[in-house]
Amino acid sequence: WSSDVCSSDLGVDYIEGGWPGANPTDSAFFDTPPRTRATFTAFGMTKRAGMSAENDDVLAAVLNANTPTVCLVGKTHDFHVDRALNISLAENTENIAVSFAHVVAQGREAICDAEHFFDGYASNPDYALEAIHAAHDAGARWIALCDTNGGTLPHDVHRITRAVIDSGIPGNRLGIHTHNDTENAVAASLAAV
């Protein structure tokens, strides 16, 4: 099979090729990307605390893959910002905004993978919305709402997605990224759209 045939037949618009710089296999994959009608996309994370977007070597590796589209994961759950990143919510919001502005300034289409969004919204809806608005306002074309733990029920996915749209992010700029830990991924995806 070829990725071009599969992406065309399935209607896939984007193919995420991995995280350049994360390991030799992912990095090598970007040296000779597949030829496809779908938009080839590099994945990475927002800039790290204490660094500028211009001087973060992890973000630079993603941009150096020279893909037309870059997808960055941004933490949207206050618990993970506090415990995993060990930074303030304000600093995380700034990191998100600066990272997406940097990607867009490089002439790339930007996708925000809003990590743990549904759990974050359940914990602190104002902050979860603040985080995705930071990406959107900085130029991210797409905001992918992530059910990273796969535990959000479909009716909650629908309600929260509606709240995101009501907060000012257009529905035609949203994506859904579900995990199937509780066998709800398909139903949750349908509820989101």
Descriptions of predicted regions:
Residues 23-48, 91-108, 112, 133, ...:
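Alpha-helix-loop-beta-strand connector modules within alpha/beta enzyme cores
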Residues 1-7:
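Short, small-residue-biased leader/transition segments that mark boundaries at the very start
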Residues 9-12, 67, 107-108, 140:
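A structural motif
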